[in-house]
């Protein structure tokens, strides 16, 4: 098939030229646009999740021969979770070539973590089908390289870490307060404050309450650890 200019540019950003571009087209087709004649990316997402998981598990296994299963598991989860896949997708501007139905397009689908993360997994599967596991694994390790290097920090759940900090000092668990909700329904922004019984507090804003709570906890924990 003839490759459109935007797909060709995306292949360059991805770092893989497809022998069978149809695999990539399917990987980028969301279910809101899929049909009997235009398969969507859900099956590829399923496959890509497994290719990503094996690639990452193997990389972590060999990277630290002394790490226990209990240490490896949170690192693995941090690297393969939907938010991380979505962040990698943004690194290569996957949203620009994501094929969406009108409703998803109008609701800001190109920016949604869920859609971007799913599509990133589907693209990994497309590379696997096009060129095999070794090529797909090499692509994953290249795109995730910086995150693999910093995975110990990413794997540390800020809310849990902040709660442990408070408990170690005889304080009750942190309290999270919703300060406001801004933006349209399809792209809300939540403002959350985390408050310790000792008076320390931080605020953060994100597209979901969970992410805003994590961001607020991380900001407060970093300030506490600096002794500020």
Swiss-Prot record:
One of its GO terms (biological process) is regulation of gene expression. Its main location: cytoplasm. Gene3D superfamilies: 3.30.160.20, Ribonuclease III domain. It comes from the Bacteria. Residues 7-132 form the RNase III domain. Its cofactor is Mg(2+). GO terms for cellular component: cytoplasm. It catalyses: Endonucleolytic cleavage to 5'-phosphomonoester. Mg(2+) binds at residues 45, 118, 121. The active site is at 49, 121. The keyword rRNA processing applies. Residues 157-226 form the DRBM domain. The keyword Translocase does not apply. One of its GO terms (molecular function) is metal ion binding. InterPro entries: dsRBD_dom, RNase_III, RNase_III_dom, RNase_III_sf. It is found in: Cytoplasm. Homodimer. Belongs to the ribonuclease III family. HAMAP family: RNase_III (MF_00104). This is Ribonuclease 3. It comes from Rhodobacter capsulatus. The lineage of its organism: Bacteria, Pseudomonadati, Pseudomonadota, Alphaproteobacteria, Rhodobacterales. The gene is rnc.
């Amino acid at each position: 098939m003839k490759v459109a200019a935007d797909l060709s540019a995306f292949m360059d950003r991805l770092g893989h030229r497809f022998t069978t571009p149809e695999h990539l087209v399917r990987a980028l087709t969301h279910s809101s646009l899929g049909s009997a004649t235009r398969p969507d990316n859900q099956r590829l997402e399923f496959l890509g999740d497994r290719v990503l998981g094996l690639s990452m598990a193997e990389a972590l296994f060999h990277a630290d021969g002394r790490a226990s299963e209990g240490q490896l598991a949170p690192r693995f989860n941090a690297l393969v979770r939907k938010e991380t896949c979505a962040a990698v997708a943004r690194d290569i501007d996957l949203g620009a070539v994501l094929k969406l139905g009108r409703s998803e397009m109008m609701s800001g689908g190109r920016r949604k973590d869920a859609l971007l993360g799913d599509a990133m997994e589907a693209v990994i599967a497309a590379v696997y089908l096009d060129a095999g596991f070794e090529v797909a694994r090499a692509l994953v390790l290249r795109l995730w390289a910086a995150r693999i290097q910093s995975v110990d920090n990413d794997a540390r759940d800020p809310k849990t870490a902040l709660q442990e900090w408070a408990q170690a000092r005889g304080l009750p668990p942190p309290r999270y307060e919703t300060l406001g909700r801004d933006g349209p329904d399809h792209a809300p922004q939540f403002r959350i404050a985390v408050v310790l019984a000792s008076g320390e507090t931080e605020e953060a804003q994100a597209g979901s309450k969970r992410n805003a709570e994590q961001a607020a906890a991380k900001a407060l924990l970093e300030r506490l650890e600096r002794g500020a």
